[in-house]
Amino acid sequence: MMLRLTTMRPMLLAAVAVMRCPSAVAFVRPPTLRYASGVRHAVSSRRLPRMSSLMEDVMEDTAPVINAAGADVRVRFAPSPTGTLHVGGARTALFNFLQAKNAGGKFILRIEDTDEARSSRESEESMLADLRWLGLEWDEGPDKGGEVGPYRQSERGEIYKEMADKLVEAGWAYPCFCTEEELIAKREQAENKNEAPQYDGTWRDADPAEVKAKMEEGVPYTYRFKVPKGKRIVIQDLVRGQVAWDAEATVGDFILLRSTGVPVYNFCVAVDDAQMGITHVVRAEEHLTNSLRQCLILDALEFPRPQYAHCSLILGEDRSKLSKRHGATSVGQFRQQGFLPSAMKNYLSLLGWNDGTEKEIFTEEELHEAFDLRRVVKSSAVFDMTKLKWMNGQHLRALAVEELVPMVGSTLVEAGVCKDAGGPFVMSAATLVQGSLELVTDAISQTQDMLGYKFDETISSEESTELVGDGFSEVVAAIVADFDAGEMPKPGAEDFSPAFKKWIKAKGKALTRKGKRLFHPIRLALTGSMSGPDIGEQLKLLELASEEGVENVSLAARIETLKAWLATQE
């Protein structure tokens, strides 16, 4: 269950008592974090400074950052289960996964489900299935456990309560009783003055007696973080270089806990990253401004900051942020369309990263070895569907036919082309289409084209005009004559392939044709197409189709079509 504000009322009343008597302030000792590797990262035990002096001084940003060279790399992917896994999220997961693989570290899966209204376990399961399809297996997560769990934010309420207590006790957080109407009015006033709409600190230094009275009346309140005056936050982003903010001018005192008692996103993330020992936070640039709030929280709790790497957004071909209007955007959609997980990973890895060469096709092992966050670029990447399909085709052609057959077989069975997903027919079809596939689903139309016979359509097309005018009827007549005389090799014979090649060679001599003038008319006559896989292998496919009860236009039926066409040429 999520932390509820009412559980903190006794603690806050005690804090109000302390506010009445500053000399009685009892500072808390910062906690020690235990990491899954068994290494304990002790946070400095020095007492926190008094808030009065802290707020008055201009502070240099000297917060400690985790030394990646001296600690086991721990990265995380933290999706919100409110929909499907978007390709942008998949790329973030991939970059984290590859960083862990390259460094011999751990890849953590954390579910950020604090939005109770929109989050669902169904969405979570869908995302986990998509990650597994991509081969991005995590080392710790909600279904695997680990030493720093729970791994769902909705189950980490006690942890957030403990950290919130520490912030309040140390003077880093305070209750705000402003109503929504008052906050709206403040925003409007700021906008009318052309000022940034920030909280004006109404309750920041409120009289403790007034705070206590409000609480005893049961007036709803939020907790706000007390942003230090003059505080400058600086991070050395691994992608974007140095990024700095004037904290007070940028965010003002922000909410930590809502009036419902539910912690806000940035508070949960900061606490989780620290408690889980995350060394590198790799995420999209839209989270860059969140780093300011998270660093303030981490600094207040005296936790070391992780290394940040904010990757540019993925854009559509019109240079706007990739969205549904650009077509498929979820991993599940690409999976259904027939893309390979290896191709998806290869393509997504190149959306913002390269290995410093012109190399584009990577195996999974090569990606594990080559990936380096320092080679992720600042500029936005454009999602090019044509390039993705080309890359998928490269990966399909790199498969052993034994790996391709199950994919093609299940695809053809699902489409109703055949019933046996692993028989000789599918083996033959997979072998024939492998060289021209971009998607596994392309096997459906390409196989159906080979089983069908579009002779009449092709012969009347402009594409075939030159071929027909070059004595095509003479070639057709020779084919028909040989078939009727039993001189054309039968596709079902064991020696069909060499016999068919020998037969074509003999036809070339008899008709004084060779090369394209020989093969192109024979292809059109026997397959009904101007291009395609090996002619003889296509005829063998027809025989296998007939044996397995797969609908096709047989060789005999094709010969009858040729005879009918010849009759029109007399």
Q: How would you describe each model-predicted region?
A:
Residues 54-192, 289-303:
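N-terminal Rossmann-like or analogous alpha/beta NTP/dinucleotide-binding catalytic cores
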Residues 522:
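Hydrophobic, well-ordered secondary-structure elements that form the walls
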Residues 423-497:
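Aromatic-anchored, charged helix-turn/loop surface patch used as a conserved interaction hotspot
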Residues 174-310, 316-322, 330, 355, ...:
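Active-site cores that bind ATP or allylic diphosphates and position pyrophosphate for catalysis
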Residues 1-38:
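N-terminal chloroplast transit peptides
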Residues 289, 302-456, 527-570:
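Catalytic adenosine-cofactor/nucleotide-binding cores of aminoacyl-tRNA synthetases and other
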Residues 26, 40-60, 68:
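N-terminal mitochondrial targeting presequences
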Residues 75-81, 108-113, 276-281, 329, ...:
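Glycine- and acidic
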